[in-house]
Amino acid sequence: VMACYNAMIPHIVTDLPELQASALGQQMKSPLIYTTVGLRQWRAFKEQGIGLAMSPGNLHQTVFMDFPVSSGGYRYTQGPDEPCVVQMISCPYSEVLGKPRAEQYREARYQMLGTPFSAYEEEVRSHLGGMLSSDHFDFDRDVASLTVNRWAHGYAVAGPGDSVAIGRQPHGRITIANSDSASEADAIAAMQMGYRAVTELSV
């Protein structure tokens, strides 16, 4: 069972039928940025009633309070004067709209990887400072940590037409899985594709 970035499979399995190799080569992954902001307190979010904010036009299109999960010796924040984590998500895109999707992802990927940490920090400062009231939020006082996680090849995105279905066909003793073969970027799809791939194995 090959459960990897599906576009790489033709480079590993070099005797694939041309149609299948071409279909796998058309699968894409969008770039993705997950920024984690550690706050010393989150009273500004509480006072403004913000749990999640959609921010079109900003680098980070989604901002939300982290999920209230306690595990082991860790317990999630119990009140707005305690530390918490805020997640900021960005799905970068090309500055030139209307281009083919693959080109937009490529341009966004290069721009994302070429951006220094200081620029991300300044964007988060501006974003949160513009969204939250200065009565309860001061970036320098309230932000304890900032982590920017960049994935050049983040979420699976379907290629054109039937390329996903064609690409995931068994080849000899090889079956193909991973979320790429469902063109959905989540664990459930990955497990479903893994199950499918195992059932396709010839005994």
Predicted region positions:
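A short, hydrophobic secondary-structure junction motif
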Residues: 1-7, 119-124
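Glycine-rich loop(s) and the adjacent beta-strand/alpha-helix scaffold that form part
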Residues: 2-55
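Conserved flavin/dinucleotide-binding core of flavoenzymes
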Residues: 38, 44-203
